[in-house]
Amino acid sequence: MLRIAKEALTFDDVLLVPAHSTVLPNTAELGTQLTATIRLNIPMLSAAMDTVTESRLAIALAQEGGLGFIHKNMSIERQAEEVSRVKKHESGVVTEPQTVTPTTTLRQVKELTARNGFAGYPVVTEDYELVGIITGRDVRFVTDLDQPVTAVMTPKERLVTVKEGETREVVLQKMHEKRVEKVLVVDDSFHLRGMITVKDFQKAERKPNACKDEHGRLRVGAAVGAGAGNEERIDALVAAGVDVLLIDSSHGHSEGVLQRIRETRAKYPNLQIVGGNVATGAGAKALADAGVSAVKVGIGPGSICTTRIVTGVGVPQITAIADAVEALEGTGIPVIADGGIRFSGDIAKAIAAGASCVMVGSMLAGTEESPGEIELYQGRSFKSYRGMGSLGAMSKGSSDRYFQTDNAADKLVPEGIEGRVAYKGLLKEIVHQQMGGLRSCMGLTGCGTINELRTKAEFVRISGAGIQESHVHDVTITKESPNYRMM
């Protein structure tokens, strides 16, 4: 006798029902929780894939209000550096600015500038008392580079400083009065406590919706595997300031993954941890019991994933999301819908099924900010996109995600493919279109917030003819729409 657990549905099997509405799309509130303590301003995450998310895309997505997860197909040092780049891009108050001592030479300052990409360094004593600042203007025309910074620095008496906790308005006023671009933060004993730059204020004004931590820095996540030897990687990422750690596996409901989560939670009680992937309520509950802050749902729905075909295992995504949400009811642990998102309507459906946010890969893989070069093929521009279960990605380091770390390169059993996606331009344009579609959904269903969409919206199940009717039909498309691409 066949052991059929249940019937399961995915995105194209359902539509949302329109309802009486007082909500205008432009008034819909898109903020949502990634975890209990991390709030997103849009419900979008980027996948931890080596053709999707490195620091450049993570910065761009965080500026739009989402959050990117840096992939792990790189050395520990490089992944930590990628995280650090995001955290330093927009700093608000730089709580630990790089400093020099009074004995540092101008030559050393020039070397630091070449290495770090910025030229301003506070000068402090051994006990961190502030004695001056050295900037690019101070050393620009100096020929004797062997003299100490004290010879040309702006001394303590002429420094522009503010006390800890000073308001943004006061800081900006001081910058304007003194015509400076950097203000140093000091305590009552004139010990250095941080630095504020005008560039960070300008960035904040341009991107008011950015997803930031309590220090005004952009938020970023990073992925690690569940196998042995990842302790050092986790330590390095935490030291680099990662906001949320993704313990990533193709099968999150396995004891090795659960044990890795327990160990990480024991070592870092306050670290935000996402666990995945699962496709059942039991899997979601097991991750919650192990100590995760959010659960990632999706086995095999991704465009480049062949897990369901190679293994015969998976659960269609709408049912998988709904089952996970039901199992986690009352725990306060959000669900992330990972994979299968092709259109903005799919984002809306995933959230209406109960997810707090979605993780996308192919949607962002062709953007300007994604890793990789633009390729020309038959007169069109493309970027490469591959699954982390593809042979190429597994040989670069993601084989542990599929429990194949001990396999030789010629013995790997892939669960993904390598391909290309059309070049899509800047990430912000993609986000604008996707969030615009989501806002329209919220207007049609009468849901003013993401939480209302999660709990109020109703589905109807549709037939194959229903989805055919939903798509463009009986016409030849002559001009492609930015939010409706069939490939």
Swiss-Prot record:
Pathway: Purine metabolism; XMP biosynthesis via de novo pathway; XMP from IMP: step 1/1. GO terms for molecular function: IMP dehydrogenase activity; metal ion binding; nucleotide binding. Mycophenolic acid (MPA) is a non-competitive inhibitor that prevents formation of the closed enzyme conformation by binding to the same site as the amobile flap. In contrast, mizoribine monophosphate (MZP) is a competitive inhibitor that induces the closed conformation. MPA is a potent inhibitor of mammalian IMPDHs but a poor inhibitor of the bacterial enzymes. MZP is a more potent inhibitor of bacterial IMPDH. GO terms for biological process: GMP biosynthetic process; GTP biosynthetic process. Its EC number is 1.1.1.205. Keywords: CBS domain, GMP biosynthesis, Metal-binding, NAD, Oxidoreductase, Potassium, Purine biosynthesis, Repeat. Its cofactor is K(+). The active site is at C305, R401. NAD(+) binds at D248, S249, S250, G298, I299, G300. PROSITE patterns: CBS, IMP_DH_GMP_RED. K(+) binds at G300, G302, C305, E469, S470, H471. It catalyses: IMP + NAD(+) + H2O = XMP + NADH + H(+). IMP binds at S303, D338, G339, G340, G361, S362, Y385, R386, G387, M388, G389, E415. Catalyzes the conversion of inosine 5'-phosphate (IMP) to xanthosine 5'-phosphate (XMP), the first committed and rate-limiting step in the de novo synthesis of guanine nucleotides, and therefore plays an important role in the regulation of cell growth. This is Inosine-5'-monophosphate dehydrogenase.
